[in-house]
From Swiss-Prot:
Gene Ontology CC terms, in alphabetical order: cytosol; mitochondrial outer membrane; mitochondrion
Taxon lineage: Eukaryota, Metazoa, Chordata, Craniata, Vertebrata
Sites of Phosphoserine modification: 189, 246, 260, 267
Name of this protein: Armadillo repeat-containing protein 1
Chief location bin: cytoplasm
UniProt subunit comment: Interacts with mitochondrial contact site and cristae organizing system (MICOS) complex components IMMT/MIC60 and MICOS10/MIC10. Interacts with mitochondrial outer membrane sorting assembly machinery (SAM) complex components SAMM50 and MTX1.
UniProt cross-references to Pfam families, sorted A to Z: Arm
C-alpha cells in the first residue's frame, strides 16, 4: 500500500517528464540548454532503459531533436552510457521496429559527428538501410507538415488536438510549440495534409493552416479547403508508425526562426532535472 501511494504522489511521472523534454527539444532554441543541463541528458539516457515502451520512444524522439544541433553532438556522444544505451535499444529483440530505426538514426548521427560531411552522409545512409531491415519492405517515406492552429492556446485544447491526430492512420509523431500555436507533424507520404486539418476542425474549437515557405524564403500561412476530407482512422491506437527520413526539413527550420520562450523552457528544465535526480538513485 505504501509503495502504491508513494507512486501516486510522485509528480510528475516518467512519461510526462520525458514528453515535456521531447516537446522542449522540438524547439531549436532550447536544444543547447537541455544538453548543457546536468540532469536532463543523463535522465534521457536512463529513460532508454525504461520498461514502458512509450517512455523509451519519447526519449529517443527528444534525443533525435537534440542531435539535430551540430554543437550538441560531441557532448552527447561522450555522455556516459549514451552510445551503449542506443546499441542496447537497437539490439534488444523486444524493441519495436520503428524504435530500432529511430535509435539507429541517432547512433549514426553521433557516431559520424567527427567524420567529414560526405563520409558522414554515406555512412548514415548505409546504417539506415541496415536498420530498415527490421521494418521489412512496407515502410514508406515520411514527410513533415507544419501547422499553425488557431485556438491552440491551452492544455485542454492541446489534449483535444492530440486525440484528433492520434486517430489518423498514417500519423507518425507530432510535437507542439504552444507559444506560437504550431504543431510539427510527421506523416506518411501517402497521407494528405488536408486530413490533419479535417481532424483538427472536427474539434469544433480549432482550425489549422499549413505553414509553407515562399520562393523568397518567407513563411506563409496557407488555408485548407473548408470541405471536410474523409480521414482513415485507427481502429485502435498503435505505437507510432515507422518513419523514414523526411524530405521537408526546411519547414522545421522555418519554425525555428519564430521565437518561442526559451526562458520558460529553461525554468522547466530545473523541475525536470530535480525529478530525474530524485527518481534514478536506487
Amino acid at each position: 500500500m505504501n509503495s502504491s501511494s508513494s507512486t501516486m504522489n510522485e509528480e510528475p511521472d516518467a512519461l510526462s517528464v520525458v514528453n515535456q523534454l521531447r516537446d522542449l527539444a522540438a524547439d531549436p532554441l532550447n536544444r543547447r540548454a537541455i544538453v548543457q543541463d546536468q540532469g536532463c541528458l543523463p535522465g534521457l539516457i536512463l529513460f532508454m532503459d525504461h520498461p514502458n515502451p512509450p517512455v523509451v520512444h519519447s526519449a529517443l524522439l527528444a534525443l533525435r531533436y537534440l542531435a539535430e544541433c551540430r554543437a550538441n553532438r560531441e557532448k552527447m556522444k561522450g555522455e556516459l552510457g549514451m552510445m551503449l544505451s542506443l546499441q542496447n535499444v537497437i539490439q534488444k529483440t523486444t524493441t519495436p521496429g520503428e524504435t530500432k530505426l529511430l535509435a539507429s538514426e541517432i547512433y549514426d548521427i553521433l557516431q559520424s559527428s567527427n567524420l567529414a560531411d560526405g563520409d558522414s552522409f554515406n555512412e548514415m545512409n548505409s546504417r539506415r538501410r541496415k536498420a530498415q531491415f527490421f521494418l521489412g519492405t512496407t515502410n514508406k517515406r515520411a514527410k513533415t507538415v507544419v501547422l499553425h492552429i488557431d485556438g491552440l492556446d491551452d492544455t485542454s485544447r492541446r489534449n483535444l488536438c492530440e486525440e484528433a491526430l492520434l486517430k489518423i492512420k498514417g500519423v507518425i509523431s507530432f510535437t507542439f510549440q504552444m507559444a506560437v500555436q504550431r504543431c510539427v507533424v510527421r506523416i506518411r507520404s501517402d497521407l494528405k495534409a488536408e486530413a490533419l486539418a479535417s481532424a483538427i476542425a472536427s474539434t469544433k474549437v480549432m482550425k489549422a493552416q499549413q505553414v509553407v515557405k515562399s520562393e523568397s524564403g518567407e513563411e506563409m500561412l496557407v488555408p485548407f479547403q473548408d470541405a471536410p476530407v474523409e480521414v482513415e482512422e485507427n481502429t485502435e491506437l498503435p505505437d507510432y508508425l515507422p518513419e523514414d527520413e523526411s524530405p521537408t526539413k526546411e519547414q522545421d527550420k522555418a519554425v525555428s526562426r519564430v521565437g518561442s520562450h526559451p526562458e520558460g523552457g529553461a525554468s522547466w528544465l530545473s523541475t525536470a532535472a530535480n525529478f530525474l535526480s530524485r527518481s534514478f538513485y536506487w
